[in-house]
């Protein structure tokens, strides 16, 4: 089930990215492909960052069928895809402008992903640890994972709104 949740998040992420690419480039097939490919490369960074900010290996937890770990990771995927969508969707006069938009949005997202996890851990789950709730229990806490996922997604929405 955890793998299915991640697959669903990847589908949602691709939908967000394709939407963002097509909004500003409805007629340019080459531009659409280049931006989509660049966005896919950026999305690979989610895996690296997420594994660094958690004290557990997401891939091992998914192999153990830890649904809660899959939910948290899915939230991170969707959050960064939302930022990538907004970065490529913003109007720019040149490829350099699009790259700058994408870089700023993605950079902020990758920097704030750990901050969102920390704030979720300390503010929304006081006295508890997300890691303990998600991986160190006999039955992983799906509710804590949903809170983590929405912390990431909510943070990405706030970043997008701050850039108009």
Name what the model sees in each region.
Residues 1, 55-72:
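Alpha-helical transmembrane segments with an aromatic anchor "belt"
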Residues 3-12, 69-80, 143-154:
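Select subsegments of transmembrane alpha-helices in polytopic membrane proteins
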Residues 14-24, 84-87, 160:
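Membrane-embedded alpha-helical segments in integral membrane proteins
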Residues 22-29, 56-59, 88-99:
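Membrane-interface helix termini and inter-helical loops of multi-pass transporters
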Residues 27-43, 97-113:
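Alpha-helical transmembrane segments
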Residues 40-60, 108-132:
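Alpha-helical transmembrane segments and their immediate juxtamembrane interface regions
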Residues 126-150:
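Interfacial loop-to-transmembrane junctions
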Residues 156-164:
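Juxtamembrane boundary at the C-terminal end of a transmembrane helix
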């Amino acid at each position: 089930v955890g793998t299915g949740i991640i697959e669903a998040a990847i589908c949602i992420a691709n939908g967000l990215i394709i939407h963002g690419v097509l909004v500003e480039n409805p007629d340019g097939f080459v531009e659409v492909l280049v931006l989509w490919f660049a966005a896919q490369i950026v999305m690979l960074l989610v895996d690296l960052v997420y594994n660094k900010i958690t004290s557990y290996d997401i891939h091992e937890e998914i192999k153990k069928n830890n649904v809660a770990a899959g939910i948290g990771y899915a939230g991170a995927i969707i959050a960064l895809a939302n930022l990538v969508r907004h970065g490529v969707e913003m109007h720019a006069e040149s490829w350099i402008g699009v790259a700058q938009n994408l870089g700023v949005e993605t950079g902020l997202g990758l920097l704030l992903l750990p901050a969102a996890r920390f704030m979720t851990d300390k503010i929304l789950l006081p006295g508890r640890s997300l890691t303990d709730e998600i991986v160190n229990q006999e039955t992983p806490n799906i509710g804590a994972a949903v809170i983590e996922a929405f912390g990431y997604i909510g943070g990405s929405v706030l970043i997008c709104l701050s850039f108009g």
